[in-house]
């Protein structure tokens, strides 16, 4: 699986998916009420950059305006007869784009699902914008004048009854808050905080409806229920702040369909640390109901073309990505399952690497870096069943600030054909090209693994991470693993030897690189050495049972994650276009920095076993050295 390096890959197009006005809802509630039956309809429009630049080229700017003033002018010029307010959450992102949000009003009352967002570029001009403003007939009279609407307590009763919310409202009293027609309810029980209500308009079916927005947080659901302000038994729409998602996939650690069955996994980002603060389906600006988020947009690409933004993705309003797969099906028949699997694998690996040090500042792949450094705007574009090739896969890694691109192909070596998206090792191998190219030489330089030996290590790192992750509880130092065996339908896999600590099973040493002229062969030697490193550290520290490592003083407590951490840290230390010896030294240096060198002997035992001993001298001819350093 060649990791294609395209340093000149164009930057991502502006986002073109209209977002709903709140986070995704969680589907069937524990009370048997289908919350999704009350979802908002999507009404937003979005003008991407190319269209925007053509539309607003004659827009009047003043060099004295700040980005908020410029954004406000655009809204006024677009809807000159409408009223709105500026939401107090504007900011300039790390990419230099200013973000300003507006809320439409009628008679001073918010239209709760009528928004306008404007993004201002570094040059002070409108970059992109979107809106869901109501353009129908406005109410002629101010409801606050006649006050012909129900008491908010009735709205609370209506929401509780209709949606079976476990709140007892019998003794509720509405206490006014600072905002106009906003109340909190005292005397209730069952909620985690006092319920609230606010009078708002809601656009639905081409009309405005006056409603009480009743807020109830009961843990499993945190609902905003839009109760009709005159007929309290009518609930127009519901928003649930609690984001929940289900995926039917081969779970993390299962390399391919031969190792287990697909299972249901719920909200996996809850178990993968802080790498995905917006969950896997949000980017801090929008929430998505498809296989897209801050880290990954995953889609099919049967044409093999360069366009990806509008390609097909599985969609689920309730974020339930549950699809069927069987080995008798052709890949096209299970593309929803394959895209979901790709989305799950890449997101999980992103989060694992994040905890190990592949963060925003290190150049990781995220659209929104959330103010934590790095360039952002560079998630990993992942194409499933890409039609540009077969029997392979690739990953393009431009410098930080430009998206990576993964192309996963189907394999025609079996009948029916097999989809590489279902072999996690292939996906992990490809994503690791992004890791190594961003870390070696720094995030801004993707040209540091171009030399033959360095390029070979790039391939080897991919196999190493893929193999380390697929280890199972009960595996031992004597367990062997192949690479690509399932997808290729080839017993023994696609490498010359399986990864093994047994010198009879895999006899590779560093001297074997001498006669090689292709990166995958060199990579197999490097990954073989690292497989010995991996098992030496597991023998010392154990394997660990959790997806995410536990840390003491910054070091993973188990050997598997410690090995992955040291290899990752080593990438950040080694020079541009390193050789094996320099990479060996960088890993040892990484251990010195992390653990004060506690694992030096375990590391050197692995390197020396495969010919990179302490007295190895790099030269034109690669001659093995099996010496251990003094003290070991």
From Swiss-Prot:
Q: Which SUPFAM superfamilies match?
A: Metalloproteases ('zincins'), catalytic domain
Note the superkingdom of the native organism: Eukaryota
UniProt keyword annotations, A-Z: Glycoprotein, Hydrolase, Metal-binding, Metalloprotease, Protease, Secreted, Signal, Zinc, Zymogen
GO-annotated molecular function: metalloendopeptidase activity; zinc ion binding
Q: Which PANTHER family match?
A: EXTRACELLULAR METALLOPROTEINASE MEP
User: Which residues are processed away as propeptide to yield the mature protein?
Assistant: 20-244
Name this protein carries in UniProt: Extracellular metalloproteinase 2
Predominant place of localization: secreted
Which enzyme class?
hydrolase
Q: Which family does it belong to?
A: Belongs to the peptidase M36 family.
């Amino acid at each position: 699986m060649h990791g294609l390096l395209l340093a000149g890959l164009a930057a991502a197009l502006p986002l073109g998916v209209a977002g709903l006005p709140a986070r995704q809802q969680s589907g069937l509630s524990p009370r048997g009420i289908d919350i999704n039956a009350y979802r908002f309809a999507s009404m937003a429009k979005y003008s991407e950059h190319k269209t925007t630049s053509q539309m607003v080229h004659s827009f009047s700017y003043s060099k004295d305006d700040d980005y908020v003033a410029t954004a406000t002018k655009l809204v006024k010029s677009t809807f000159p007869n409408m009223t709105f307010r500026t939401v107090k959450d504007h900011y300039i992102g790390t990419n230099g784009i200013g973000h300003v949000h507006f809320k439409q009003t009628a008679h001073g009352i918010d239209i709760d699902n009528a928004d306008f967002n404007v993004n201002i570029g570094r040059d002070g001009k409108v970059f992109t914008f979107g809106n869901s403003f109501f353009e129908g007939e406005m109410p002629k009279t101010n409801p606050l004048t006649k006050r012909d609407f129900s008491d908010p307590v009735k709205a609370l009763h209506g929401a509780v009854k209709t949606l079976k919310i476990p709140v007892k409202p019998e003794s509720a009293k509405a206490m006014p808050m600072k905002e106009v027609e906003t109340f909190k309810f005292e005397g209730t029980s069952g909620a985690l905080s006092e319920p609230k209500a606010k009078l708002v308009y809601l656009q639905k079916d081409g009309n405005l409806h006056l409603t009480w927005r009743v807020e109830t947080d009961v843990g499993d659901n945190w609902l905003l229920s839009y109760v009709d302000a005159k007929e309290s038994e009518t609930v127009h729409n519901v928003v649930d702040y609690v984001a929940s998602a289900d995926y039917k996939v081969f779970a993390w650690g299962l390399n391919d369909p031969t190792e287990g069955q697909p299972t249901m996994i719920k909200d996996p980002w809850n178990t993968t640390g802080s790498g995905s603060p917006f969950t896997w389906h949000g980017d801090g600006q929008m929430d998505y109901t498809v296989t897209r988020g801050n880290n990954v947009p995953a889609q099919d690409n049967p044409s093999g073309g360069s366009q990806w933004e509008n390609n097909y993705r599985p969609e689920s309003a309730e974020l339930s990505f549950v699809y069927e797969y069987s080995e008798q099906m052709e890949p096209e028949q299970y593309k929803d399952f394959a895209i979901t699997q790709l989305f799950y694998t890449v997101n999980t690996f992103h989060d694992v690497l994040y905890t190990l040090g592949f963060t925003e500042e290190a150049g990781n792949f995220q659209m929104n870096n959330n103010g934590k450094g790095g360039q952002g705007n560079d998630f990993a574009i992942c194409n499933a069943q890409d039609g540009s090739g077969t029997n392979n896969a690739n990953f393009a890694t431009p410098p930080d600030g430009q998206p990576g691109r993964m192309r996963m192909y189907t394999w025609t070596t079996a009948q029916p054909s097999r989809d590489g998206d279902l072999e996690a090792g292939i996906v992990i191998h490809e994503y690791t090209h992004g890791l190594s190219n961003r870390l070696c030489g720094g995030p801004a330089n993707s040209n540091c693994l171009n030399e033959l030996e360095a390029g070979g290590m790039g391939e080897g790192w991919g196999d190493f991470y893929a193999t380390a992750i697929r280890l199972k509880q009960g595996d031992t130092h004597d367990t062997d693993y192949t690479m690509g065996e399932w997808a290729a339908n080839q017993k023994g896999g696609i490498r010359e030897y399986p990864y093994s600590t047994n010198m009879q099973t895999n006899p590779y040493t560093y001297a074997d690189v001498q006669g090689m002229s292709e990166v995958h062969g060199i990579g197999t030697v490097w990954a073989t050495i690292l497989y010995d490193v991996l098992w030496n550290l597991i023998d010392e520290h154990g394997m660990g049972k959790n997806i995410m490592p536990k840390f003491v003083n910054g070091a993973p407590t188990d050997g598997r994650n410690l090995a992955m951490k040291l290899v990752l840290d080593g990438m950040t230390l080694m020079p541009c276009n390193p050789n094996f010896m320099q990479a060996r030294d960088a890993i040892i240096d990484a251990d010195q920095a992390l653990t004060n060198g506690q694992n030096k002997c375990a590391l050197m035992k692995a390197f020396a076993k495969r010919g990179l001993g302490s007295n190895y001298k790099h030269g034109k001819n690669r001659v093995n050295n099996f010496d251990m350093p003094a003290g070991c």
